[in-house]
């Protein structure tokens, strides 16, 4: 049995380190049942649960409230709500603002619940000229714009010794999100790049830089960190961002005015996406 092919098969289900542990268990099985054993484990490992992460409590509060068969579970510093939304088993969590909080929460969620997919929902600032307040951005991929190891020959945004400059979202999730967006009214849906940094962007100069340097569609503070951890664990992910401001000098005022509306739209969209 050639295990390299099994690694390729199992990559969407669990990482290579975990895969090597499973090989220790199945290596003495007859060849005829080895692949079936891997497939059975993979299904159990992934389950049918979708993890939903928001940076702020207000981004997930309504979803928590709407959960059926609700169960609250604490894992370390994180309070998860497990239940059903639109008939789909989900687990929700507030990560906290910023990349470190987002990454830590994502790993905690994966370790505790082994989700089939991860959705990061919330609000963002528009970077692309065609995207405006209350529109939806579906992530094609995500990168960390404030990662700078250019002195060592890496492109701006590249994490040293990582394979990816940008972390690509899962194609089937993208396709479904675009279809759901097309079916809903009141906003336009775009596919594009999410750029993440520990900074609230509120200057035209910074906005233009992100657009030209990274071909960014929107900017926010958590998505690429969630994407990185999901990818390391072999969990398909998608970032959904409703636009709360246009990342310019008016951004603080615009954000305050439109945040609630953008979050309400996000809740409605997630409920449709889960159906």
Where are these predicted regions, by residue range?
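A C-terminal functional module that forms or caps the active site or interfaces directly
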Residues: 200-246
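His/Asp/Glu-rich mid-to-C-terminal helical/loop segments that flank catalytic regions of hydrolases
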Residues: 247-275
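Mid-sequence, gly/pro-rich, charge-dense loop/helix-turn segments that line enzyme active sites
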Residues: 127-214
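Short, Lys/Arg-enriched N-terminal segments with co-localized hydrophobic residues
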Residues: 21-28, 41-48
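Polybasic, lysine-rich low-complexity intrinsically disordered segments
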Residues: 7-9, 16-22, 35, 40
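N-terminal short beta-loop-beta anion/metal-coordinating cradle
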Residues: 47-107, 113
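Proline-aspartate-enriched helix->loop->beta-strand connector
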Residues: 114-119
